C-alpha cells in the first residue's frame, strides 16, 4: 500500500505550502474535470516512481482541552497514529517556539517515525538556522523552503528511504492480469459496505455493525466467483483483537485512500436515503485522481419511493457529474438485489482498465478525430498531432506525439478522450491523455551552427 506521510506543526509554519507543492500534479490532473470537489487535506503524490499519500493538518496544539483547537488536535492525533511517518515542520525564520517543544514531546510519545524539517530557510545558512532545533531531540533538522522548493525532494526521498520504499521494479509497474483483481469497497460511514461484502462472498467473514464508522484497518477478503479469484478490500468493517471483532468509533479517511490507491476497481457506495455529501464527493474525487476503474452502487434502494429515487438519480448526475465514465447501480446489499449486474460491471470496468490499445489503431482514431474537428489555432499556428500509442494501463494512458502540443486545450483533450473511449468501448475507467512534443531537429541544428566559430 502507498505509505502515508503526515505534515504537522503549529500554525503558520508553511504546512499547506509544503502540501500544495507536493500535490501540484494532483491539482493539474483534475483541473479539467467539471464539478470535481477536492479534499484539501489529503493528496496522492509521486516522487519519481514512488507514490505516497500526503496529509495536511491544522495548527497543532496537542494539550488543548476545549473548542475548535481541541477538535483539530484530536483529528491530528488520529491521523498521526495512522501515518507511516510524520514530517514535523518548524519555522526557521522565527526560531524555536514553546509550542514546538510541546509538539515534539507528543510526537516522541507516539512512537511514529519523525523527520524534523526547518522551513523558510531560503537565503540563510543552514547550520545557523537549524542550530536551535537540535534540542528537540528528533534527530538532525532538515532545512527546506516550501515556497521555493529548496530541499523538498531530498526531504521526501529521506522519508521514503527510511520506510524502505524502493523504486518499483519493471514488473511492478505493469499490472499483472494473472493476479487476483483487487476491489476496494469505499464510501462514507454506514452506507452498507460490510453488508455488501458479506453478501458477495456469501459468509460472515466481515461482521457488519449498524453504527457509523467501524474500523481503521482495511480488511482484505479473498474469495472466488465463478471460478475466478478476487480480493475484496473493506475499509468500513472492524478491527480484530485475537478472535474478537471490535467496533471502532471513527471512519478512517487514510485507510480509504490507501485502499483506493492499492486496488484495481473501486465500488463507491452511496446511501439512497441520504443526500450526496461533501465527504461522498471527496472520496469520489480521490478515485478519479487515482485513475481507478469505478462502479457506483446506490444502496438501500428498496427502502425509498419513486419520488426519492428520481431525486437521487438527479442528485448523482449533478453533484457527481465528473463520474460520468462509471455505471450507477441501484442495489440492496441486505437483500442482495442488483448485485449480479453490479459484479458484471466490476469485471467489465477491470477489463476496460487493462485493455491493450494497438498503436496503429490509436493513430487512425486520432487522425479521424482531427479530420472531424481540428484543434484551435494558437497564435499563427495550429498544434500538429501526428501519432499515438499506449503509455500505460489501469488507467489506460494514450500518449500523443506532435508539435506545438502545449496549445492543445483541455476541451480538445476531452474530445479526444471521448473518441478513444467510444471506439474501444472503454466503460467504467478513466482514460488519461499525455502530450509529447517532438523536438525540431532543424531548430536544434541551427542552434548548433550559430554556436560554431568560423
From Swiss-Prot:
Q: Which CDD domains match?
A: EngA1 (cd01894), EngA2 (cd01895)
Gene label? der
The record's similarity note reads: Belongs to the TRAFAC class TrmE-Era-EngA-EngB-Septin-like GTPase superfamily. EngA (Der) GTPase family.
Q: Which residues form the EngA-type G domain?
A: 3-167, 181-354
What interactions and quaternary structure are annotated? Associates with the 50S ribosomal subunit.
Question: Where would one find coiled-coil regions in this protein?
Answer: none
Supply the name of the protein: GTPase Der
MF terms (GO), sorted A to Z = GTP binding; ribosome binding
Give the KH-like domain ranges: 355-439
Q: Which Gene3D superfamilies match?
A: 3.30.300.20, P-loop containing nucleotide triphosphate hydrolases (3.40.50.300)
Name the residues that bind GTP 1.
Answer: 9-16, 56-60, 119-122
TM spans (from-to): none
The species this protein belongs to is Polynucleobacter necessarius subsp. necessarius (strain STIR1)
Protein keywords? GTP-binding, Nucleotide-binding, Repeat, Ribosome biogenesis
Biological process (GO) annotations? Answer: ribosome biogenesis
